[in-house]
């Protein structure tokens, strides 16, 4: 039985889904349905845990309230002597997705990222091809009149001006300048190494998610837009090799929804899982699970990217706490740094660091990640059950260059904190997982004296930064590993697109929120112009 008919059914109300729901429903003749498994987050009822933009760890202290419950993954690659335990992976399950729960840093990446996409077969996705969509999405409070920035988009972006930095932050900048890193001011228009006030998606001190920016009250009242939250897509409906709709569990009812086109925006773990359950993926894997093959696309679930990370923390001394309490609150948390490890001269700017001190938590921190990784992982289905999670292995540090980059990053941090401006605080730096920054780990200086212990610690404790991407990548039709074309259309079937971080050929040198906003804008434009 067919319950409802739409032109576009969007599966996943995260960052990308919010964009597409807005842009496609802007045309009154388009009947659009957005389906989200998690809760709604309307402007007048945003949970306080996710509203505070200056305390971005709060959602992670709320258990699985805003995340897919009990979703576990493997982070580190297999290695002799290293025990791998499944770890909880916080993937947003609420309107706005990752933009509602992750860090609020707004980073585009580097032009070379998108030129690389073009070289890998994503025609039209080079820097000049994506820049207009970065501009379209943003309302930059500091650089809105700059030709590289926008001043009229749905997402506000701002920074804490250096005039309002805390004394501790100023001391950190002095250490960085002594190490040869200049203030580049705008990380999204200057692409060399240096430090800067990070750009945030904030309105005042409030988080500004994609749902808040693209699904405000003026959009929600559109009669041609339907929003179903707390609803679970069970499967895609097919006729031959055509995708004709979705089966949805809504409350206690299972509904069959017909669509002219289905667009997957469920994220880099859930979107490929839906493809695989539909019979789109590596034929051998599908046969092994008894799933009829609709389209043999070996790249589905492969090419899984993530930024490897580690953290360093130290309890604040009395003087450090006092100095961290000055200036505007935002400046106490983070000072952004783009740096080069030197591991591979062909890929400079391969590290991204934050240095800060928070008088509320009583901790100084220096967290960083491999900004241009070389390791990739994969995901596979365990079974065909729509309620089962896929088996996910990020395979971090499988490429030895990434291990070298983490080591180099730790040595850079040691070098920065040894400068007189920071050394005066007498901070005892200890290792900590980025996913749960807390004191109590081994002292950094001790580990740096023992190469074997350092490597063992990194392989055991390496984290990610919730930047999963690449599992249904764009590419040319003759590329067996490509899953979608330049407009997000899935090869081998009709009526189906993917339009989230899954389609990234490589992970950008950036947090993935802004790139995901950009790509959703670009795919929406392609749909509306039928490119």
UniProtKB/Swiss-Prot annotation:
It catalyses: 5-hydroxymethylfurfural + 3 O2 + 2 H2O = 2,5-dicarboxyfuran + 3 H2O2 + 2 H(+); benzylthiol + O2 = benzothialdehyde + H2O2. Optimum pH is 8.0. GO terms for molecular function: FAD binding; oxidoreductase activity, acting on a sulfur group of donors, oxygen as acceptor; oxidoreductase activity, acting on the CH-OH group of donors, oxygen as acceptor. Its EC number is 1.1.3.47, 1.8.3.-. Changing residue 369 to A: 7.5-fold reduction in catalytic efficiency on vanillyl alcohol. InterPro entries: FAD/NAD-bd_sf, GMC_OxRdtase, GMC_OxRdtase_N, GMC_OxRtase_C. Because 5-hydroxymethylfurfural can be derived from sugars, the enzyme is of particular interest for the production of biobased plastic materials in an environmentally friendly industrial process. Changing residue 467 to A: Abolishes activity. Changing residue 466 to A: 39-fold reduction in catalytic efficiency on vanillyl alcohol. In contrast to wild-type, is active on secondary alcohols, such as (S)-1-phenylethanol, and is strictly enantionselective as this mutant has no activity on (R)-1-phenylethanol. Keywords: FAD, Flavoprotein, Oxidoreductase. It is an enzyme of class 1 (oxidoreductase). Optimum temperature is 55 degrees Celsius. FAD binds at residues 15-16, 36-37, 68, 94, 98, 102-105, 233, 466, 501, 512-513. Pfam families: GMC_oxred_C, GMC_oxred_N. The keyword Nucleotidyltransferase does not apply. Transmembrane segments: none annotated. The active site is at residue 467. It comes from the Bacteria. Its cofactor is FAD. SUPFAM superfamilies: FAD-linked reductases, C-terminal domain (SSF54373), FAD/NAD(P)-binding domain (SSF51905). Monomer. Belongs to the GMC oxidoreductase family. Involved in the degradation and detoxification of 5-(hydroxymethyl)furfural (HMF) by mediating its oxidation to furan-2,5-dicarboxylate (FDCA), a biobased platform chemical for the production of polymers. Active with a wide range of aromatic and aliphatic primary alcohols and aldehydes: acts on alcohol groups and requires the spontaneous hydration of aldehyde groups for their oxidation. To a lesser extent, is also able to catalyze the oxidation of thiols that are structurally similar to its alcohol substrates, yielding the corresponding thiocarbonyls. At pH 7.0, phenylmethanethiol is oxidized to the corresponding aromatic thioaldehyde, benzothialdehyde, and no formation of 1,2-dibenzyldisulfane is observed, demonstrating that HMFO does not catalyze the formation of disulfide bonds. At pH 8.0, two products are formed, benzothialdehyde and benzaldehyde; this suggests that the thioaldehyde is slowly hydrated, yielding the aldehyde as the final product. This is 5-(hydroxymethyl)furfural oxidase.
């Amino acid at each position: 039985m067919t319950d409802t008919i739409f032109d576009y059914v969007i599966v996943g109300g995260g960052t990308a889904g919010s964009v597409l729901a807005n842009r496609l429903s802007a045309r009154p003749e388009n009947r659009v349905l957005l389906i989200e498994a998690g809760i709604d987050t309307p402007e007048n009822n945003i949970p306080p845990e996710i509203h505070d933009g200056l305390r971005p760890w709060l959602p992670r202290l709320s258990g699985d309230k805003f995340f897919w419950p009990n979703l576990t993954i493997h982070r580190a690659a297999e290695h002799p002597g290293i025990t791998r335990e499944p770890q909880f992976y916080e993937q947003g399950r609420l309107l706005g997705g990752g933009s509602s729960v992750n860090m609020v840093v707004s980073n585009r990446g580097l032009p070379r990222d998108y030129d690389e996409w073009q070289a890998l077969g994503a025609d039209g996705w080079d820097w000049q091809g994506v820049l207009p969509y970065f501009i379209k999405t943003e309302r930059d409070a500091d650089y809105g009149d700059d030709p590289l920035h926008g001043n009229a988009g749905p997402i506000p972006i701002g920074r804490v001006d250096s005039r309002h930095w805390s004394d501790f932050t100023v001391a950190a900048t002095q250490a960085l300048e002594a190490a040869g890193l200049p203030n580049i001011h705008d990380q999204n228009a200057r692409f060399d190494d240096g430090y800067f006030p990070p750009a945030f998606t904030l309105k005042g001190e409030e988080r500004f998610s994609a749902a808040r920016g693209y699904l405000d009250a003026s959009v929600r009242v559109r009669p041609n837009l339907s929003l179903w939250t707390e609803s679970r897509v069970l499967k895609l409906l097919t006729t031959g090799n055509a995708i004709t709709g979705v089966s949805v569990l809504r409350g206690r009812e299972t509904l069959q929804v017909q669509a002219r086109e289905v667009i997957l925006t469920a994220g880099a773990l859930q979107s490929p899982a839906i493809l695989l359950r539909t019979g789109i993926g590596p034929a051998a894997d599908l046969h092994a699970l008894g799933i009829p093959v609709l389209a043999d696309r070996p790249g589905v679930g492969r090419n899984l990217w993530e930024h490897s990370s580690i953290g360093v923390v130290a309890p604040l001394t009395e003087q450090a706490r006092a100095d961290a309490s000055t200036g505007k609150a935002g400046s106490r948390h983070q000072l952004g740094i783009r740096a080069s490890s030197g591991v591979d001269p062909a890929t400079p700017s391969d590290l991204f660091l934050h240095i800060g001190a928070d008088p509320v938590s009583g901790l100084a921190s220096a967290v960083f990640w491999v900004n241009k990784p070389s390791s990739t992982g994969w995901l596979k289905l365990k079974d065909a059950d729509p309620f089962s999670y896929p088996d996910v292995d990020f395979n971090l540090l499988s490429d030895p260059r990434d291990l070298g980059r983490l080591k180099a990053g730790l040595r850079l941090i040691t070098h920065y904190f040894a400068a007189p401006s920071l050394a005066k605080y007498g901070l005892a730096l200890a290792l900590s997982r980025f996913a749960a920054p807390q004191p109590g780990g081994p002292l950094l200086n001790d580990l740096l004296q023992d190469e074997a212990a350092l490597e063992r610690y990194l392989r055991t404790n390496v984290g990610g930064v919730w930047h999963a991407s690449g599992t249904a990548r764009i590419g040319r039709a003759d590329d067996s590993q490509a899953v979608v074309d330049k407009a997000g259309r899935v090869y081998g079937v009709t009526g189906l697109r993917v339009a989230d971080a899954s389609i990234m050929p490589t992970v950008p040198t950036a947090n993935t929120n802004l790139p995901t906003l950009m790509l959703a804008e670009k795919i929406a434009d392609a749909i509306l112009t039928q490119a």
